[in-house]
Amino acid sequence: MAQGCPITGLEVALTDLQSSQNNVRHHTEEISVDRLVVRRGQAFSITLYFKNRGFQPGMDSIMFVAETGPLPDLAKGTRAVFSFTGSGGPSPWIASLEANRANSLEVSLCAPPIAAVGRYLLKIRIDSYQGFVTAYQLGEFILLFNPWCPADSVYLESEPQRQEYVVNDYGFIYQGSKSWIRPCPWNYGQFEENIIDICLELLEKSLNFQVDPSTDCALRGSPVYTSRVVCAMINSNDDNGVLNGNWSENYVDGINPAEWTGSVAILKQWHATGCQPVRYGQCWVFAAVMCTVMRCLGIPTRVITNFDSGHDTDGNLIIDEYYDNTGRILENMKKDTVWNFHVWNECWMARKDLPPGYGGWQVLDATPQETSNGLYCCGPASVKAIKEGEIDLNYDTRFAFSMVNADCMSWLVYGGKEQKLHQDTATVGNFISTKSIQSDERDDITESYKYEEGSLQEREVFLKALQKLQATRSQGPHQANSNPFSSVPPRHNSARSPDSPSLQPSDVLQVSLKFELLDSPKMGQDINFVLLAVNMSPQFKDLKLNLSAQSLLHDGSPLVPFWQDTAFITLFPEEEKSYPCKILYSQYSQYLSTDKLIRISALGEEKNSPEKILVNKIITLTFPGIMINVLGAAFVNQPLTVQVVFSNPLSEPVEDCVLTLEGSGLFRKQQRVLIGVLKPHHKASITLKTVPFKSGQRQIQANLRSNRFKDIKGYKNVYVDIGL
């Protein structure tokens, strides 16, 4: 400065947060290009432009302030004060001088890898020579978890995994049954417009924030804490969470869960209605919406499906199922069930609250089943702890263990009494599935949750879990009847296969029963199958067999039986006989649930023995999907024509047909097309235009619903080029 010129306070004229450049470096450019969204543990640059002069290190002292939450507190780490010389305190932030020009200053700032995530206000205080002090608000930014930062507790080493579990905004959720695993496309849309704001709003609507906002904001640096808050907020059982659950088959005042194809419409509806819960969701919808929120916040997350999933309500690692003497499954008196499939999330994080070795993938289940510390949430439970039977480790590991490894006990109820029929040690936990990394294929990750069925290690882990449970609880009168501690049968010595028969021999009767399908059961067609009876003894056997069929919800809840039959079979020594069965479409069509699941059962008895034998099989009716064709190459900001081909698989007309389509980066909002009536076995197609607004790999998701079916789905992967 020239001699004689008065020294004035340094005044900021303009701040450039360099949002576009910073967001690219922080992998948040799809969230926004004009708002600063950065990740903790990684530097970002800003430029300060001054009014009157440049920054003079000997005469000017700059102090930065970063604040989050309604009551920023230095001690709690929600307020940070730091300068170019560093800072102290529980969560040190870093400021570095990058370039000092005539009237501007380029600065690099970095939040510590333990900083609380959320919305921040950045301020500056400048102390100049002779006591001049100026202070400014430089702007707002959003801070997220950083799986690219080795010091962050959500660090994930593999770049392909980071791309799949943080960046990818579409995927598949597996449904159906272990014999017919069906990939259902889903639009996570974590980078769609306003989704980041809705995710932060979700945190602020939590009970934790409402009770103690200061502490809640301070704890948001922990992915363990944050994931539990999000998990509780996805369902609405304790609060104004995102989704109402409904398994009643009555959805007249909302949306059938099977019709959803993405999270964006759900989250935006929740926000637009003043945070009123959206109607309705079931397990895969809860898990999909949670995946969207967690990926948006920066925690690596994937969606997991477990086929034949145990729901053990009383915590004894036994799933009790009850049948009457016709073979009909009864509404469970204890509410234990085996869900045909159940869907939850895995989130990747360190677990410093647990012994070494239990970090990595953690189970989080937002479906409201049981409470955890008074709230309807489940987890995070270490997948490693589940596999090792460490059911006493936080959080809710016992419940998660039972979902994949409980035993099943079958009971016959008659004359006010209960007779034990069978204890099955191999039913629960099959084909645990998730989408492959950067592929449309399915990954089977069952071995991450349990040792091979029938192995010594698997048996030892199960017994360890039982011993831990026995040490922490006492059994009630009814539980004593199904007490697994006194006599635990050995596990079947065979690996599971989707085609393995449900052969259940009785040691007393020396008779086995199993069902065999004669053809693949399709929606709208008759179901043909046989009951195979085998006499494994040297004596004659006179059998009476009561057969029944009833629809199931995917959570295992039975509906009204619609078919019954009685068979009398005489078996010569070591003879095998087949009893043919047929269920007409006209017999089951009016009784189907949305899930299109039918359970056939047979209860057998031999006239010279009081023992009973039970066999059952779950049938999933298949149906054709939707075909989507993209006509021509796709370019950003250029019209694209999409053709959708669909059909009515039934021999009767269906009404109220509605087609919905969506896809992040392809459609600004969900498209809804009224089709009306589809004639029997009629194939139809429509074309529509859209203008892609994001480049890269994208996906179109489609759903067709009618008065007779709700979830005929299809998808199409589309690569969108930037163009010229």
UniProtKB/Swiss-Prot annotation:
Compartment(s): Cytoplasm
EC numbers for this chain: 2.3.2.13
PROSITE patterns: TRANSGLUTAMINASES
Residues reported in the UniProt entry to bind Ca(2+): N405, D407, E453, E458
Chemical reaction(s) catalysed: L-glutaminyl-[protein] + L-lysyl-[protein] = [protein]-L-lysyl-N(6)-5-L-glutamyl-[protein] + NH4(+)
Highest taxon of source: Eukaryota
Keyword tags: Acetylation, Acyltransferase, Calcium, Cytoplasm, Metal-binding, Transferase
Key word Transferase present: yes
Active-site residues annotated for this sequence: C283, H342, D365
Main location: cytoplasm
GO cellular component terms listed in the entry, alphabetical order: cytoplasm
GO molecular function: metal ion binding; protein-glutamine gamma-glutamyltransferase activity
Cofactors, names only: Ca(2+)
Biased composition (Polar residues): 473-486, 495-505
Residue ranges of the region described as Disordered: 473-505
SMART domains: TGc
Cofactor binding annotation: Binds 1 Ca(2+) ion per subunit.
Annotated Pfam families: Transglut_C, Transglut_core, Transglut_N
Modified positions (N-acetylalanine) in chain numbering: A2
Family, as annotated: Belongs to the transglutaminase superfamily. Transglutaminase family.
Main function: Catalyzes the cross-linking of proteins and the conjugation of polyamines to proteins. Contributes to the formation of the cornified cell envelope of keratinocytes.
Record-given protein name: Protein-glutamine gamma-glutamyltransferase 5
